[in-house]
Amino acid sequence: MHELSLCESVIETIMDNVRTHHFSQVRRVRLTVGRFAGVETEALRFSFDVVARGTLVEGAELELLEEPGAAWCFDCSETVPLMDRLDPCPRCGGTRLHPTAGTDVMIKDLEVI
């Protein structure tokens, strides 16, 4: 379950910012989760709550925003939207695709006090 290690990294990054900017509490965390990131959202939510315990992030609302998938098609030389990483190019039907979007998990923003 790599969601646990993802949450550990997210909480560590948030706590670094909390200390740097002297925030007293984190109320909301918005994460962008790519369609191709291979993240199970329920496992991510569970892991977030577990890892946040005992920190200033504990009790914060976790909002997950899905980043759509896209890929560069080597056959038609276009960047195309994809619903599934294994789908063929919707433009030409090619299967030689390299993902260009939807592979990351990123902190979009925080609501803090």
From Swiss-Prot:
Pfam families: HypA. The keyword Zinc applies. PROSITE patterns: HYPA. InterPro entries: Hydgase_Ni_incorp_HypA/HybF_CS, HypA/HybF. Zn(2+) binds at residues 73, 76, 89, 92. Ni(2+) binds at residue 2. Keywords: Metal-binding, Nickel, Zinc. GO terms for molecular function: nickel cation binding; zinc ion binding. GO terms for biological process: protein maturation; protein modification process. Belongs to the HypA/HybF family. Involved in the maturation of [NiFe] hydrogenases. Required for nickel insertion into the metal center of the hydrogenase. This is Hydrogenase maturation factor HypA. It comes from Beijerinckia indica subsp. indica (strain ATCC 9039 / DSM 1715 / NCIMB 8712).
